[in-house]
Amino acid sequence: MKPSIYGLTRDELIAWAIDNGQKAFRATQIWDWLYRKRVQSFDEMTNISKEFLAILKDSFCINPLKQRVAQESADGTVKYLFELPDGMLIETVLMRQHYGQSVCVTTQVGCNIGCTFCASGLIKKQRDLNSGEITAQIMMVQNYFDQRGQDERVSHVVVMGIGEPFDNYQNVMTFLRTINDDHGLAIGARHITVSTSGLAHKIREFANEGVQVNLAVSLHAPNNELRSSIMRINRSFPLDKLFSAIEYYIETTNRRVTFEYIMLNKVNDGVEQAQELADLTKRIRKLSYVNLIPYNPVSEHDQYSRSPKERVAAFYDILKKNGVNCVVRQEHGTDIDAACGQLRSNTMKKDRQKAATART
């Protein structure tokens, strides 16, 4: 399968065009066709010579994704299941917000982080997505707007789908530079958030990139014992290493870090844990924010359940009394396969059942 041209940054596309005997402005024209006019075929690029179009077609495809499923929620959330060229499946989510249209993208096929509450890790990592496959997710949603004649654009991006973004670092960075490019989609860096489960060394590397993209950290527990029991990654990057990297990030970028904290009933949602969390984040309080996330139950992880509203409220109150900037996250798509990885997992189960039935 040819690589997607979406996998190139504008500078890389210019270099490729020059290597193929073209002037730099040809690459700029192609970039405009891809991201401003958003064509679906190289043949639609009417100001590109037939000879150069032939080279383009021999070298690249445009969009490598095929839509398998689209579930639309009553609140306007759309959950997509896309098929990759090798037949593997990934999820992408469109969330309609009061401030714009936000898309959550996937960076890996499966996940090896091993969080015990998460649907994404039910199927182990099979491979990284390349940068073109990540960018194509944004283009699929933008095409959805365009085809409906909706004067809307993808304005915000969260890199929080299946997989650990910092375990696919270079492809994610290429993706970020592509969607942020002022000559293309021009999605503002401050409208983009990358979430990590806590790869401390990559947080430091990210701090040195000089990008204005937001950082979120999946914390989910305020002490090492509990965090190691629900997030295997903590055994490699315990809280002292993680927070050292976070402090370095804040000192280097002067940017706020968001902590994601999923509320698991009688696991991590007690008043003691709330106080521990307040104490843990005290040193970086001015440049940190806690996002309390209602749990979407996963049948394979039935040892966990959603925290009742009164426990969430008590937890929230303790954080606020300690001066912690925090919010209970607004839910999206609760009437569809809401948990990250759930649509993919359920579809793969159905595919296996169909295959088994066909054999009998």
UniProtKB/Swiss-Prot annotation:
Cofactor entry: [4Fe-4S] cluster
Entry binding sites for S-adenosyl-L-methionine: 163-164, 195, 218-220, 296
Function as written in the Swiss-Prot or TrEMBL entry: Specifically methylates position 2 of adenine 2503 in 23S rRNA and position 2 of adenine 37 in tRNAs.
Family matches, as PROSITE patterns: RADICAL_SAM
Pfam families (alphabetical): Radical_SAM, RlmN_N
Protein name: Probable dual-specificity RNA methyltransferase RlmN
Binding-site positions, [4Fe-4S] cluster: 111, 115, 118
Family: Belongs to the radical SAM superfamily. RlmN family.
Keyword Translocase: no
Taxonomic source organism: Streptococcus equi subsp. zooepidemicus (strain H70)
